[in-house]
Amino acid sequence: MLVLFVATWSDLGLCKKRPKPGGWNTGGSRYPGQGSPGGNRYPPQGGGGWGQPHGGGWGQPHGGGWGQPHGGGWGQPHGGGWGQGGGTHNQWHKPNKPKTSMKHMAGAAAAGAVVGGLGGYMLGSAMSRPLIHFGNDYEDRYYRENMYRYPNQVYYRPVDQYSNQNNFVHDCVNITIKQHTVTTTTKGENFTETDVKMMERVVEQMCITQYEKESQAYYQRGSSMVLFSSPPVILLISFLI
């Protein structure tokens, strides 16, 4: 009986010293599956946190950030920048600059601009064709019916290249009629003697108007130069500067 009592007492002592199986943060089964080697884990893992098949963060199959299947940034399937499937293949590019239309580059010579190929002549601004009476009803009617075929701009050189108005007007009429005739004839239209006579009258009036306009502008430019070159004005400008 004594031997049986001692054996029973020894078994009870060993049970008290034996660690409990399982439990939180012990060597047994653990939940979630984070533990020391040898413990049972649920679910089976390869060394990462809960729901980490390959060692990444929550919901990371291959070690990237949240929602990153292969280690890129948010919404990056293969490691590129935002919205990039892989590398720089799908990067955003700036749109090409719109090409300038030829309509914006082409155009007639501007009023007062030097016309290339005419030896320094300039093209004046468009004018209304003057109402001219030629002394008989036939020519007056002919002019009214055909005036749209005649020039409404004149070619001229700067007024300071001429000694008087007559020289300016004579040169202006000749070059204008010549250019208009050549251009119009190239298009298949011919002028009669009556047309040439009427064009000379029309262009002469427009050349006189152009001379008066250019002379006034030239005089104003000269007056401005004289004003700003006077000693009092120069002294005032120097003081202001």
From Swiss-Prot:
<feature type="repeat" description="1">
    <location>
        <begin position="44"/>
        <end position="52"/>
    </location>
</feature>
<feature type="glycosylation site" description="N-linked (GlcNAc...) asparagine">
    <location>
        <position position="174"/>
    </location>
</feature>
<feature type="binding site">
    <location>
        <position position="80"/>
    </location>
    <ligand>
        <name>Cu(2+) 4</name>
    </ligand>
</feature>
<feature type="region of interest" description="Interaction with ADGRG6">
    <location>
        <begin position="16"/>
        <end position="31"/>
    </location>
</feature>
<feature type="binding site">
    <location>
        <position position="72"/>
    </location>
    <ligand>
        <name>Cu(2+) 3</name>
    </ligand>
</feature>
<dbReference type="GO" id="GO:0005886">
    <property type="term" value="C:plasma membrane"/>
</dbReference>
<feature type="lipid moiety-binding region" description="GPI-anchor amidated serine">
    <location>
        <position position="223"/>
    </location>
</feature>
<feature type="binding site">
    <location>
        <position position="64"/>
    </location>
    <ligand>
        <name>Cu(2+) 2</name>
    </ligand>
</feature>
<feature type="signal peptide">
    <location>
        <begin position="1"/>
        <end position="15"/>
    </location>
</feature>
<comment type="function">
    <text>Its primary physiological function is unclear. May play a role in neuronal development and synaptic plasticity. May be required for neuronal myelin sheath maintenance. May promote myelin homeostasis through acting as an agonist for ADGRG6 receptor. May play a role in iron uptake and iron homeostasis. Soluble oligomers are toxic to cultured neuroblastoma cells and induce apoptosis (in vitro). Association with GPC1 (via its heparan sulfate chains) targets PRNP to lipid rafts. Also provides Cu(2+) or Zn(2+) for the ascorbate-mediated GPC1 deaminase degradation of its heparan sulfate side chains.</text>
</comment>
<dbReference type="InterPro" id="IPR025860">
    <property type="entry name" value="Prion_N"/>
</dbReference>
<dbReference type="Pfam" id="PF11587">
    <property type="entry name" value="Prion_bPrPp"/>
</dbReference>
<keyword id="KW-0336">GPI-anchor</keyword>
<comment type="similarity">
    <text>Belongs to the prion family.</text>
</comment>
<keyword id="KW-0732">Signal</keyword>
<dbReference type="InterPro" id="IPR000817">
    <property type="entry name" value="Prion"/>
</dbReference>
<keyword id="KW-0862">Zinc</keyword>
<feature type="binding site">
    <location>
        <position position="78"/>
    </location>
    <ligand>
        <name>Cu(2+) 4</name>
    </ligand>
</feature>
<keyword id="KW-0034">Amyloid</keyword>
<feature type="binding site">
    <location>
        <position position="79"/>
    </location>
    <ligand>
        <name>Cu(2+) 4</name>
    </ligand>
</feature>
<keyword id="KW-1015">Disulfide bond</keyword>
<feature type="binding site">
    <location>
        <position position="55"/>
    </location>
    <ligand>
        <name>Cu(2+) 1</name>
    </ligand>
</feature>
<keyword id="KW-0677">Repeat</keyword>
<feature type="propeptide" description="Removed in mature form">
    <location>
        <begin position="224"/>
        <end position="241"/>
    </location>
</feature>
<keyword id="KW-0640">Prion</keyword>
<keyword id="KW-0325">Glycoprotein</keyword>
<feature type="glycosylation site" description="N-linked (GlcNAc...) asparagine">
    <location>
        <position position="190"/>
    </location>
</feature>
<feature type="binding site">
    <location>
        <position position="54"/>
    </location>
    <ligand>
        <name>Cu(2+) 1</name>
    </ligand>
</feature>
<feature type="repeat" description="4">
    <location>
        <begin position="69"/>
        <end position="76"/>
    </location>
</feature>
<keyword id="KW-0479">Metal-binding</keyword>
<comment type="subunit">
    <text>Monomer and homodimer. Has a tendency to aggregate into amyloid fibrils containing a cross-beta spine, formed by a steric zipper of superposed beta-strands. Soluble oligomers may represent an intermediate stage on the path to fibril formation. Copper binding may promote oligomerization. Interacts with GRB2, APP, ERI3/PRNPIP and SYN1. Mislocalized cytosolically exposed PrP interacts with MGRN1; this interaction alters MGRN1 subcellular location and causes lysosomal enlargement. Interacts with APP. Interacts with KIAA1191. Interacts with ADGRG6.</text>
</comment>
<keyword id="KW-0333">Golgi apparatus</keyword>
<feature type="binding site">
    <location>
        <position position="71"/>
    </location>
    <ligand>
        <name>Cu(2+) 3</name>
    </ligand>
</feature>
<feature type="binding site">
    <location>
        <position position="63"/>
    </location>
    <ligand>
        <name>Cu(2+) 2</name>
    </ligand>
</feature>
<feature type="repeat" description="3">
    <location>
        <begin position="61"/>
        <end position="68"/>
    </location>
</feature>
<feature type="binding site">
    <location>
        <position position="62"/>
    </location>
    <ligand>
        <name>Cu(2+) 2</name>
    </ligand>
</feature>
<dbReference type="InterPro" id="IPR022416">
    <property type="entry name" value="Prion/Doppel_prot_b-ribbon_dom"/>
</dbReference>
<feature type="disulfide bond">
    <location>
        <begin position="172"/>
        <end position="207"/>
    </location>
</feature>
<dbReference type="InterPro" id="IPR020949">
    <property type="entry name" value="Prion_copper_b_octapeptide"/>
</dbReference>
<protein>
    <recommendedName>
        <fullName>Major prion protein</fullName>
    </recommendedName>
</protein>
<keyword id="KW-0449">Lipoprotein</keyword>
<keyword id="KW-0186">Copper</keyword>
